[in-house]
């Protein structure tokens, strides 16, 4: 999908905050939205949290009308949803880069429609920037890797010899055709598949998946883990839905991908 050039605009206040947190700065401390268990596992995996990073984009999502009786992608809306997320992600990566981080873990992508304007939505990307104790873990583009895996899954991934390259995503906003009255009446009271609806949902998910896979291929990934397939209605009404696919692209660091077998643990209680 073609998009406009992504412009990373970071507020001055954010840059001052990042400068204070940068490793080596006087009184530097880290911030993180990881849980205690996740934080300790990320440290065990050989990474040190350096700061909470975020990116935001307030985006006006325009209007595109689908044909009443037709299944069709609303490509302008697909591009808008994709581009807005890309802006937020890029600004988050820019903050991580300012901290000298090698990657961002536990990334969350959220959308919140605002009441102070019609069709205005804030796209937010937030995660914990981390720096490796040894070596460089940046991707082939020289950017910090991004991952939406939990701290536990990130630890397991690294322990088994894989490296995250980046979050990859695909979006498809699709208009699902209305069922004509004669067909709807003919199906009344019957158990029967509705091929028009089946084809619409199938096609929309496939488009989202294929776009996510194309992003993974661009990163020279071996695979994508933790994939989520989401159906998001937003505010467009019952027959227009965004199908969104997202996951973490990975590649192998070594041929051996075994993990230690779990051990037996006995509690020291009488319950």
Question: Language-model segments: which ranges?
Answer:
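Intrinsic disorder/low-complexity detector
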Residues: 1-77, 119-197, 248-271
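Short amphipathic alpha-helical surface micro-motifs
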Residues: 30-38, 87-88, 106-108, 146-152, ...
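Short, flexible coil/linker segments at or flanking structured domains
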Residues: 41, 47, 69, 92, ...
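Short, well-ordered alpha-helical segments
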Residues: 53, 67-108, 168, 173, ...
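Hydrophobic, ordered structural segments
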Residues: 84-138
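Short, conserved loop-to-beta-strand elements that form functional interface hotspots
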Residues: 103-115, 223-236, 257-265
